[in-house]
Amino acid sequence: MKYFLLLFLLVLSFTLVESVYQYQILILEPIYRFTDSAAVPAKSIYFTNLPQHFSLTQKSSKLDLSQFNVVRGFTQEMFLKNLGCGTDTCQNFPATVTSVYNIIDLKGRLKFETNPAGTDNVLGKAGYLATEEIEGLVRYDEYYSEEDDSFTYTNGKYPNQFGACQLRDYGKLRYKFVRTLGHAFTAVAIPENLPIYSIFAYDDGLPEPTTTVSPTLSPTQYVFETNPIWKILKNSKNGTQGVGAVNLPWTPPVSASPIEPTNVCLLNGNSSVLSRYGEIDRMLQFFDDTHVIIGFKDSIQDASNTFIYSYIGYAFKSSDNLCGIPLKPIRELYKAGVGNTVVAGDDYSDLISSGYMLTGNIIGYTIDCNSTTDGELIVMIPDGISTISSTTILLTSQFATSSPSQIVGYYVQPVKIVGPSASGGEQGYWVDPELPEPQIGDVLGISNVCLFTASSSIISKCGYTRNIYVYYDNVDKFYFVSLYTFGRSVTSKVIGIAFETEENSCGLNLVPIRELYKDRYYVVAGNDYQYLIDDGYNITGNIVGYTVDCKDSKDEFVYGHLPSYAFSTTTSSMTTTASDSTTSDSSVIVSSSKNPAVSNPFITTYSLPSSPNNPFISITTTPDSASSQKISTTTAISHSAYSASPSTIPTTTPYDLTKPLPKLDCNIIENYGDLNGRMVNFANVMEVGDNITITGHIWQNASESTFNLYVGMDPKYLQSYISIHINMRWATDGIVYNYFWGMWNYQFESYSTRPFSRGLPYVLSVVRGINYYDVYGNGQFIKKFGIIGSVALHQVGAMYGYQQWNIDTVKMNCARSHTTTVEPSTPLETASTSQSTPSATLTSTTENIPSTSKIPETSTTQRPTSPILTSGATSTSSSTESTTTSPTTSTTTTLPPTTTPYNLSAPIPKLDCNTIQFYGNLLWRPVVFSRYMEVGDNITLTGFIWNNATESNVNFYLGFNPLFGTTAVPVHISQRWSSSARIIYNNFWGQWGPEAFSARPFTRGQPFVISLIKTANSHQIYGNGQLLINFGYRGTASQNLIGSMIAYRESTIDTVSMACVRPPTTPTTTTSTTTTTTPKLTTTSTLPSTSTAIATTDVSTRPRSCDINSITLGEGDANTPQLQLDAVLGESSGSSLSIYCRGLPNYSIYMMFNVNQGGPPPVIDGYLEITLDCLPDSEGVWTFGGREITAISCFQAPKCSTFVPSFWRSVDLPILSPTSRVVMLLTWQ
């Protein structure tokens, strides 16, 4: 949920005054775009009411509306819906609005109009726009094309002025800015079958007392004003009571009056200072049909007919704070017929005696009003907590290369405006760090626009960035600066890097790059452009990008936070106590005394060197390592009496984002971070039989994910021709295919099914045929796309993936070898590694290239629980560790990789000192260990954090039967992305304990590695290779016997690994899946064949002969309490399958087999589990006690009576003995 806030600060005699924010829900009217797909180029019109368009079947003399036959959906900008609106007011919006109409003008052109003329044909009111610029609203501009004689509408915030599809539709049209109609709204939620709405926050103009810094206080003391929460009588039909602020500055929709104050006092003051004490948030006041309540903004997320009324103060989200503030829980109480009230702390006996009951809801934490003095709270900041914002720290351009830094400098240079040279010519722009002065003319001046000129791969981690060009229009003979060509015939030169929007994650103060015009001269400026207006320039209305103002730079650097990098995971062996690694040389190199559970000697450290002589930021690694001749390591353990045998502690190596991408030359590009939005150029054009494969993750909130194969070498995005365009539109079920040859031809759009899912990994492959492409998704053939036009012209030389997915690797498998020298495709050296592991594994890859083969065949065998080893050959030893690095790269030819989908139907095996992977997203799936964690054991999770994550959690449970919300949790790890930059740790033993905190090294939209290591009296948690916290035991050692885990909320879990100090006592059981993908090509070209074996363990199991999907499981009903329960699949070991059902603790649980057949004896403890057998002679049928089982249903009843459905008449219970059979007559009680 997005809130737009207007800050209004008054500083008067040491008093900071912060205004009250009013929150209001606004219902919006979406604007739909309709396109005439037959027009070349495509034309579009805009309507705000979808049925209205279809009702206009009549043909105007100037305009045939029926020809606009393609609905492009609604735009990002929306009008205020016409609900209770007047001349200049609508929905109580606190600013002046103006009406907007759909009209057809005298020339027969459809457009929006705020003041229709008498000659205009008014079709209907479209909605309302705000008349003034307010933060949170977007400018709504009108553009006109002379070529097309039509109007189009968009906002002035985006540099290309149109969305991607609109820009393609209008690629050959030149639209000129006409006017700004007003300011439009954007939606924060688009629910199904509900109104589209936005939440708007505005300053009410009334001062609210906040932090007062008295001259008598020390610099570390702050005063916060407090205000009590009042009981409020809501004057509705039943006159129920609520709670909220006593001073209501605005009249609510239903009037209310105060009764008396509670002892709950909220804080008001400088939130940036207050947030240094602990996790705080705004407390809001809500109202519904009958009540007035308080809570944080997320407390009504799923409530209906509940509205935000006003902001009333700050409260803490937990009882922990760093300054000793006596926080009390804000408890909610309720009395039937009266309503709600609240109390701070445990003193509520008088309310209980008067008929109130605790609801169990803890709204937040604040102080008791009795803790204040004259309504003020004085807080002293302890040593070590800075009260100065990091943005006020004086930064210099000198960075120490030996120490890591969170603040980095980004190299920028100003755009210089260049006039005609003496020999004639046109005015242009110049920025080039390699040349001291421009060579094309005289410098007229230096603009206040500074562009980034460092590596785009680094600055792109701050937000959406692209190369910005100076273009020369070959037709109209003028220069202009932009991120895109707007379909013009141009020549271009890259002059820097700019952002597409003003949003960034590095704390950079971005300003719009505004375009101004005078006498065929186009110039750019930031927010300060008055001097150009005075010189006769006019604003064109175009914003061509976002960058920094030169006044914010210092010595050609601007400073911001280091963006979070993608990480690749490597493992290094834990140091063993008194262990030796020996080679032929017997000399001792190093002796170390490091606790493996505390510090990892092999963790890579990073430094960020930067100097004026080398302005480009680079990442270097400084491994703590020595020669590998002989290493004698002695481990001194100060607090735990155990010896760590070889295991794995994850380390994290950042992708080298400073290197430009190499050309893809029949190899793989990986370890360069997210390749989304980066053009991957090929060393040679694609040939028949070549296969391009990409892998990665699809965002959980993705709306579109797109893949293009471009024609030509070194193509340009939105300019060059596209041979095949693959577009996944997640609002629909399929994939759209097309091509782009100067324009989109929607008549050639085709479709296929989509095997991918949001939030999960994917594998997408495209194989080139003679006159077609074969497309594979997750191992399935999904589309044969015929090449359109002359095949000889489709010389594909690059690929480009963009929009809402991550691209981790791009690989090309070629049908024939190329003679070119292959450069290393990754910045990491190819290594052959020998290391100590619990069990030996040998992996080899053999390529057989026959003389003739017409079909590229690839066969891959995967073992889901065995790790993939990327080295060419791996051997193991019980006491050695050595690494040999080969700096050379040889040219090899491989064939298309298999695209094996994850086996999402296979039950998850027990984690037995191994790795669970290839089971899709393990989120919400219980992972049960084969034994309790022992001292020195390490559990490691790898995965990906969603881009829109609000919370990502992991629970490590007591025992082997994790019940979410019930089973004890010795270690709970919570990342709350929307409210804190910390990680929260806790335990659950019937109730939550006190919270602990650490820094958070993870970032939304990036991969992560998190590990938990057990010691004698604590659990140590590592994140991306860093020790985050030493979390001491809560309770006894027996209360910290971790045997299972569940990860939940917004993340993707790819692997869960367990590294054990003691080898497993039972052979490792591996569940295997085998998939063979054969792309069929109707070509006579000679293609090689490759057989690849992926690393497997040496123990395999007999394939299961019974299908787990053959059992029909009953579902629970909606009664309270339930009578019928869910029957749930449990574990499967191949020859057995567990089924369980769970009910209330004091109820009896019954199971029914097949159709009205008795099941096992009932149980009284609320949990019933059985095991079905799949015997060798059962012919693929699950059995229980020799009986064939096809369906199972579960029921519960109070144990004190026989409570079963009336349709049960007589029930056969299972055979209890060979000679006895029990029959019970059950009736409705």
UniProtKB/Swiss-Prot annotation:
Limits of the Galectin domain: 678-813, 925-1059
Key words, A-Z: Glycoprotein, Lectin, Repeat, Signal
Any one GO molecular function term: carbohydrate binding
Residues annotated as glycosylated: N238, N270, N370, N538, N691, N701, N903, N938, N948, N1146
InterPro entries, A to Z: C6_domain, ConA-like_dom_sf, Galectin-like, Galectin_CRD
Record's compositionally biased regions (Polar residues): 818-829, 847-869
Region feature (Disordered): 818-903, 1061-1087
Signal peptide positions on this chain: 1-19
S-S bonds: none
Biased composition (Low complexity): 830-846, 870-901, 1067-1087
PROSITE patterns, per database record: GALECTIN (PS51304)
Name assigned to this protein: Putative uncharacterized protein F40H6.5
The species this protein was found in: Caenorhabditis elegans
